[in-house]
Amino acid sequence: MKKTFFSHDKNFYVALFPLLIIISLQNLISYSVNMADNIMLGAYSQNALSGAALVNQVFFLIQQAAVVIGDGLVVIASQYWGQKRMEPIRQITGMVLKIAFCLGIFLILLCSLFPGAILGFFTSDTAILSEAGSYLQIIKYTFLLYLVTQVLLSALRSVETVRIAFVISCISLVVNVSINYTLIYGRFGFPELGIRGAAIGTMISRCLEFLIVFIYVIKIDKKLKLFSDKAVFHIDKLLRSDYVKVAVPVFISGMLWAISVPMQTAILGHLSSDAIAANSVASTFYQYMKVVVLAMSSASSVMMGKAVGKGDLDEVKAAARTLSVLDGDIGMILGAVLYFTKDFLLAQYTLSPTATQLTEQLIIIMAIVMVGMAYQMPVGSGIIRGAGDTKFSLYVNMISTWGIVLPLSLSAAFWWKWPIPAVVICLQSDQIFKGLPIFLRFRSYKWIHKLTRDK
């Protein structure tokens, strides 16, 4: 076959774009669920909103744990999917389900035994702690179901089954918003439960999500066939070793990033109330644009793993080049959309003149950042990591975020006393520090690692 810069495989595009669109919509709906919770609790009381936000700091770490153990599964399983070998995929999935189950039980016990210590780490306000305690008391039981659900969805994604995740997100949005509206405010004859109502809504949604995906895997799925044999219950020592080698760097990288996020938010939070408001508004729009980038990263990981599994090195390189160019194009489009809609978006808020001006400046900064982020994240976490090189992303994240960005941002904010836009530029500068090494690594093609074992 003649070598080409872009992939000419029609099946590649037929598989890529449905993945990208469906995962984008799923991410958008999931983000909207969180937004709806915040809006309804914010309208009920500030303490309820703050209490839920406090518990969500804990849940954010759990979400990232689910993402990283799922990503480790996808990296290996998608390569076996490229070879159409289902038994190793079922074995790896079974092993990761056991990890998720043990982690979920541990988290429930931790939150049951030490709720005060966990919540007290974030605030000393007794009113907020009381609301957070009521929320955590109910929500903690969803941690196990959430982790298991996400592992099952990751296994399905590794074999290019993503529509069920979108359907689940849609159902979860409707159920969660409906129950929250009913129980938070006490509508339709139900008692007014406030933050406890929000927790009950989330718990019911999580139970429903688990039931739907479990029934789908058992009764409907025709690819994974998870329980068609006893492979899911068998732990192969070699496969376990392969998973650990892949998942540990992914886990460390994900957790380091997850810990850095609230630290970056805290830096702006200690500058001024206008900075908090401006960052909140600008970040909301940025996150909505980011769902496409996250989807591209997820889709790229599956596509690259599948390509490497097939063993056609020329097609792997062509597919990677195609994806990287698409990443740059998507970044420029998203950045332009964010920039040209800033006036309309700002008109939806009532902010002080200072906060409005600051928000506009931050949106412009984030529109520019979007271009870099839309390249480095899908290439680094999608193409390179999806093709089997999980250690490189760990090194890049450690050095750029913890070695450069956080020290630079802390110095800019509290030592050099730079203006808030300059501090935000420092906080977002990891897109530059990550972008160059990721580009150079990408061009070397040393990231193509075969992870599958011969039959």
Language-model-derived ranges and their functions:
Residues M1-I23, A77-L144, E192-A247, M304-M370, ...:
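Short alpha-helical transmembrane segments in multi-pass integral membrane proteins
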Residues A15, S30-Y31, Q63-A65, D71, ...:
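Hydrophobic alpha-helical transmembrane segments of integral membrane proteins
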Residues P18-D37, I138, T149, S172, ...:
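Transmembrane helical elements of multi-pass membrane transporters/channels
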Residues L25, I29, V33, I62-A66, ...:
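Residue-level hotspots within pore-lining transmembrane alpha-helices
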Residues L28, S32-S50, L119-T126, T182-L193, ...:
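Helix-terminus/linker motif at the lipid-water interface of multi-pass membrane proteins
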Residues M35-I39, V151-A155, S178-Y185, F214, ...:
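Alpha-helical transmembrane segments of multipass membrane proteins
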Residues L49-L109, Y146-A165, A278-K342, M373-V396:
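Small-residue-rich hydrophobic transmembrane alpha-helices
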Residues G70, I139-S158, A165-L173, A198-F214, ...:
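Short runs within selected transmembrane alpha-helices of multi-pass transporters and secretion channels
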